[in-house]
Curated annotation (Swiss-Prot):
Principal subcellular localisation of the protein: cytoplasm
InterPro entries: RBP11-like, RBP11-like_dimer, RNA_pol_Rpb11_13-16kDa_CS, Rpo11-like
Catalytic activity of the protein: RNA(n) + a ribonucleoside 5'-triphosphate = RNA(n+1) + diphosphate
Family the entry assigns: Belongs to the archaeal Rpo11/eukaryotic RPB11/RPC19 RNA polymerase subunit family.
UniProt KW Nucleotidyltransferase keyword: yes
Keyword set, alphabetical order: Cytoplasm, DNA-directed RNA polymerase, Nucleotidyltransferase, Transcription, Transferase
GO terms classed as biological process: DNA-templated transcription
Family annotation (SUPFAM superfamilies): RBP11-like subunits of RNA polymerase
Protein name: DNA-directed RNA polymerase subunit Rpo11
GO CC list: cytoplasm; DNA-directed RNA polymerase complex
SS bond list: none
Organism in which the protein naturally occurs: Pyrobaculum aerophilum (strain ATCC 51768 / DSM 7523 / JCM 9630 / CIP 104966 / NBRC 100827 / IM2)
Residue ranges of the TM segments: none
Function text: DNA-dependent RNA polymerase (RNAP) catalyzes the transcription of DNA into RNA using the four ribonucleoside triphosphates as substrates.
Amino acid sequence: MSPVLRLEILKLDDKYLELKAKGETYTLFSPLVEYLSNDPDVEYVQFDVDHPLQENAYFKLKVKRGNPLEAIQRAVNAILSDLEELERGFFS
Protein backbone atom coordinates (compact mmCIF):
# COMPACT_ATOMS: atom_id res chain seq x y z
CA MET A 1 0.00 0.00 0.00
CA SER A 2 1.45 3.37 -0.98
CA PRO A 3 1.42 6.28 1.46
CA VAL A 4 -1.17 8.99 0.97
CA LEU A 5 -0.06 12.61 0.88
CA ARG A 6 -2.24 14.61 3.25
CA LEU A 7 -2.50 18.22 2.09
CA GLU A 8 -4.41 21.02 3.75
CA ILE A 9 -4.85 24.10 1.57
CA LEU A 10 -4.48 27.11 3.83
CA LYS A 11 -4.92 29.73 1.10
CA LEU A 12 -5.49 29.59 -2.64
CA ASP A 13 -6.24 32.37 -5.08
CA ASP A 14 -5.35 33.13 -8.69
CA LYS A 15 -1.66 33.90 -7.93
CA TYR A 16 -0.92 32.41 -4.51
CA LEU A 17 -1.00 29.00 -2.85
CA GLU A 18 -0.21 28.16 0.75
CA LEU A 19 -0.56 24.64 2.05
CA LYS A 20 0.37 22.32 4.87
CA ALA A 21 1.55 18.80 4.12
CA LYS A 22 1.08 16.50 7.08
CA GLY A 23 3.69 13.82 7.61
CA GLU A 24 6.15 15.40 5.17
CA THR A 25 9.57 16.90 5.64
CA TYR A 26 12.23 17.79 3.09
CA THR A 27 11.95 14.83 0.72
CA LEU A 28 8.99 16.06 -1.31
CA PHE A 29 9.44 19.80 -1.18
CA SER A 30 13.19 20.20 -1.77
CA PRO A 31 13.08 19.11 -5.43
CA LEU A 32 9.73 20.82 -6.01
CA VAL A 33 11.07 24.15 -4.75
CA GLU A 34 14.25 23.69 -6.80
CA TYR A 35 12.30 23.18 -10.03
CA LEU A 36 9.78 25.93 -9.27
CA SER A 37 12.64 28.35 -8.57
CA ASN A 38 13.73 27.91 -12.19
CA ASP A 39 10.28 28.74 -13.58
CA PRO A 40 10.22 32.33 -14.93
CA ASP A 41 6.50 32.59 -14.06
CA VAL A 42 7.20 32.02 -10.35
CA GLU A 43 7.64 35.13 -8.21
CA TYR A 44 8.66 33.21 -5.10
CA VAL A 45 8.46 29.75 -3.62
CA GLN A 46 9.43 28.49 -0.19
CA PHE A 47 8.79 25.76 2.29
CA ASP A 48 9.48 25.29 5.95
CA VAL A 49 9.27 22.29 8.23
CA ASP A 50 8.04 22.72 11.77
CA HIS A 51 9.55 20.67 14.56
CA PRO A 52 11.05 17.45 13.10
CA LEU A 53 8.88 15.27 15.33
CA GLN A 54 5.74 16.94 13.98
CA GLU A 55 6.65 16.24 10.32
CA ASN A 56 4.56 19.03 8.84
CA ALA A 57 5.79 21.06 5.90
CA TYR A 58 4.40 24.48 5.01
CA PHE A 59 4.63 25.44 1.34
CA LYS A 60 4.10 28.89 -0.22
CA LEU A 61 4.05 29.73 -3.91
CA LYS A 62 3.32 33.02 -5.67
CA VAL A 63 3.28 33.29 -9.45
CA LYS A 64 3.63 36.27 -11.79
CA ARG A 65 1.69 34.66 -14.65
CA GLY A 66 -0.68 31.73 -14.80
CA ASN A 67 -1.85 30.15 -11.58
CA PRO A 68 0.04 28.30 -8.86
CA LEU A 69 -1.46 24.90 -9.62
CA GLU A 70 -0.29 25.13 -13.25
CA ALA A 71 3.22 26.01 -12.05
CA ILE A 72 3.25 22.98 -9.75
CA GLN A 73 2.07 20.76 -12.60
CA ARG A 74 4.91 22.02 -14.84
CA ALA A 75 7.46 21.38 -12.08
CA VAL A 76 6.14 17.88 -11.37
CA ASN A 77 6.22 17.05 -15.09
CA ALA A 78 9.82 18.30 -15.32
CA ILE A 79 10.84 16.23 -12.28
CA LEU A 80 9.21 13.11 -13.73
CA SER A 81 10.88 13.71 -17.10
CA ASP A 82 14.29 14.05 -15.46
CA LEU A 83 13.72 10.88 -13.42
CA GLU A 84 12.74 8.97 -16.57
CA GLU A 85 15.91 10.21 -18.29
CA LEU A 86 17.98 9.12 -15.30
CA GLU A 87 16.32 5.71 -15.34
CA ARG A 88 17.06 5.30 -19.07
CA GLY A 89 20.69 6.19 -18.37
CA PHE A 90 20.98 3.44 -15.80
CA PHE A 91 19.02 0.70 -17.52
CA SER A 92 19.56 1.13 -21.25
